[in-house]
């Protein structure tokens, strides 16, 4: 498959307690890496998956940049290891649809990502990917509105629960991959993209 799209529960079946899939059975990162067959340069999209873009429905407040980066990194790792070009996660409505529309229009991964950032969404992280430093990881979300609250609803084995938590910084749109990859390269042999960092918020090729 050139496109793998998952919309379901988050999982703790990867290393560091994040990663994997929840289908009929729980699927580990190792199973994805050893059993899933993707075409070279495939795109992997996660829609509204707890932890997939950073934030999870079970969070109590701001998880912090490091935890958000670790979650996204661990979800993405097995797919990128087996040849995917890009991992993209979006917790907003039709965010994945808009991303794909832009990709099919010929935009690069980074352009698709930038276009998917809604009003009020801020860029939190943009740096080398910890497991493959030749790739980029970017994470965005909203900042906290002090004095306000959000109602979190969860459904576990048919039991629905709601709780009110203070609003905090969220991590809701993320990607890992080559920012310059576009649909014109999807059938080409994978090429190497290298980032040389000057400082934390800028880079050159």
Regions found by a protein language model. Name each.
Residues 1-59, 67, 143, 175, ...:
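Catalytic-core segments of thiol-dependent peptidases
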Residues 54-205:
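Active-site-proximal C-terminal subdomain of hydrolase catalytic domains
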């Amino acid at each position: 498959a050139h496109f793998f799209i998952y919309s379901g529960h988050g999982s703790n079946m990867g290393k560091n307690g994040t990663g994997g899939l929840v289908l009929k059975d729980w699927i580990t990162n190792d199973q994805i890496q050893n059993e899933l067959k993707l075409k070279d340069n495939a795109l992997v999209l996660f829609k509204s998956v707890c932890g997939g873009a950073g934030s999870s429905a079970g969070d109590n407040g701001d998880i912090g940049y490091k935890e958000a980066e670790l979650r996204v990194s661990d979800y993405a790792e097995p797919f990128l290891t087996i040849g995917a070009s890009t991992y993209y996660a979006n917790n907003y409505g039709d965010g994945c649809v808009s991303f794909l529309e832009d990709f099919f229009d010929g935009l690069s991964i980074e352009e698709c990502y930038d276009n998917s950032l809604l009003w009020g969404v801020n860029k939190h992280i943009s740096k080398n990917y910890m497991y493959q430093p030749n790739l980029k990881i970017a994470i965005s979300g909203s900042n906290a509105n002090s004095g306000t609250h959000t109602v979190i609803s969860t459904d576990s084995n048919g039991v629905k629960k709601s709780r009110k938590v203070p609003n905090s910084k969220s991590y809701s749109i993320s990607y890992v991959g080559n920012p310059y990859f576009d649909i014109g390269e999807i059938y080409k042999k994978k090429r190497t993209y290298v980032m040389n960092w000057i400082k934390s918020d800028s880079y050159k090729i």
